């Protein structure tokens, strides 16, 4: 489902929804697109399409999302951590980083002298 002419005042632009949904929001330049994308409480995934790899890297770095896809979407591998920023999750699934949810690190120093 594609929603066109979406503005940031609309509920569909501000809440995390799941399913095959695309909300199209107009922007003037790359910096505005990043501001719009980051101006929400969620940050599970983001996608960037660009012919300019330098721009794609800059935008991917600036986006506050746990996963950023460049010129693709929904690529995954069990060895790569998956999870979101902000209210889109706590911790990471997949990979060794997922173990952090189930373990607590402790340091103990003992002087045996």
Give the location of each predicted region.
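Conserved C-terminal structural/oligomerization subdomain of aldehyde/semialdehyde dehydrogenase
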Residues: 1-113
């Amino acid at each position: 489902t594609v929603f066109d002419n979406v503005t940031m005042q609309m509920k569909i632009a501000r809440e995390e929804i799941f399913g095959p949904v695309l909300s199209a929001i107009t922007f003037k330049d790359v910096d505005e697109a990043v501001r719009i994308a980051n101006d929400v409480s969620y940050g599970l995934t983001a996608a960037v399409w660009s012919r300019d790899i330098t721009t794609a890297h800059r935008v991917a770095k600036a986006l506050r999302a746990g996963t950023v896809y460049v010129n693709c979407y929904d690529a995954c591998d069990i060895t790569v951590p998956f999870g979101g920023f902000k209210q889109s999750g706590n911790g990471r699934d997949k990979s060794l980083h997922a173990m952090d949810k189930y373990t607590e690190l402790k340091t103990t120093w003992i002087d045996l002298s």
